[in-house]
Amino acid sequence: MTQIYHQYKKKLSTKVILLSALTLCITFSLPYANAERYPDVPVAFKYGTGARVDNHLYVGLGSAGQSWYRLDTDKASSGWQKIADFPGQPREQAVTVALSGKLYVFGGVGKNSASDTQVRALDDVYQYDPQTNQWQRLATRAPRGLVGTAATTLNGTQALLLGGVNKAIFDGYFTDLAAAGGNETQKNAVVNAYFDQAPADYFYNRDVLMYDPAKNQWKSGGQVPFLGTAGSAITAKKGDLILINGEIKPGLRTAAVWQGKTQGTELKWQQRPDLIGAEKGAVQEGLAGAFAGVSHDVVLVGGGANFPGSWQQFNAGQLYAHQGLKKQWQQPIYALVDNQWQVAGKLPQPLAYGVSIQDKDKVILLGGETSDGVATSAVTQLSWQGGKLHLE
């Protein structure tokens, strides 16, 4: 039986390694070498998705509806171009992986049809061919509903999908809310019953899902040895997968970081250092909806959102851990250097739930939402050079 690591308890003090104020000043004043600033996306969007194929960046969905846009990074001054609209229903939190020169869009949260009255966890898959500018829905369904799922590829030919909510529980919550109608007492009962549960009782997905587009088949990549998460950041480093934070139940995030290495047909997992707090002695509440990537072998993580105080309430025995707390969008950027996290700098503004795209040794951050959920069209480039973080 696989041992599951239950990281419930959090220490209320965390060692933090801070760069000097002078270093931070230098970091923000110098763009990295040979950088060309990428233009903002034509529309502000959040909860969208995207990927890179060759020298083109693609983003769409979320609050952008069915729209998708493409940027040729070799001709960035020409700006973003609109491509064919997504043929499926509008959705948020879909994930996209570029495989063999095509985009594959998985799941999300939305309606099954235009006439549907309820959002639900979706399991459909769409393919986009840049050569023909055409979309098609594939004759397959993911083995799980894909909301809050993290996705990447380690070989460019197969997609790896991890985490995400339990479809039955997630869909059931919205069904029960709809059934309550205008009865506030009944609605409150539904909300309290949903949030007042232990992390394991949400049955977040622990299966590693592998999709092979050549065969249009799903396979098992084993199970993770820790609680399933939703909204984790994900990136790849030297052929290994890095899974960063995410929520272990609604409103409660984990600071854990895991590394997955391919071993046969499955992934072998090793825990990396937990993400540190943004200030000396501060608790790291964990992040959901953060941005992540790798630059010159340094893992970079920035932004995200959480509920400060949620771990304190949870450790005091309150399962509804974020009750009465205010959601906070985060600004710090962290770097994993020599297997140790440090606070490397800050984003231009608090930001979460956008798109991270790896572009060689740059990490491109596109869109997302700022404080109080306001969508942005901003594009920011991160890189690590000379022991410093650079933003453009």
From Swiss-Prot:
Transmembrane segments: none annotated. Gene3D superfamilies: Kelch-type beta propeller. Its main location: periplasm. It is an enzyme of class 5 (isomerase). It is found in: Periplasm. Its EC number is 5.1.3.24. It comes from the Bacteria. Pfam families: NANM (PF24996). It catalyses: N-acetyl-alpha-neuraminate = N-acetyl-beta-neuraminate. GO terms for molecular function: racemase and epimerase activity, acting on carbohydrates and derivatives. GO terms for cellular component: periplasmic space. Residues 1-35 form the signal peptide. Kelch repeats lie at residues 56-100, 102-155, 157-192, 193-238, 241-290, 312-361, 363-392. Keywords: Carbohydrate metabolism, Isomerase, Kelch repeat, Periplasm, Repeat, Signal. The active site is at E247. Converts alpha-N-acetylneuranimic acid (Neu5Ac) to the beta-anomer, accelerating the equilibrium between the alpha- and beta-anomers. Probably facilitates sialidase-negative bacteria to compete successfully for limited amounts of extracellular Neu5Ac, which is likely taken up in the beta-anomer. In addition, the rapid removal of sialic acid from solution might be advantageous to the bacterium to damp down host responses. Homodimer. NCBIfam families: muta_rot_YjhT (TIGR03547), PRK14131.1 (NF010730). Belongs to the NanM family. This is N-acetylneuraminate epimerase. It comes from Yersinia enterocolitica serotype O:8 / biotype 1B (strain NCTC 13174 / 8081). The lineage of its organism: Bacteria, Pseudomonadati, Pseudomonadota, Gammaproteobacteria, Enterobacterales.
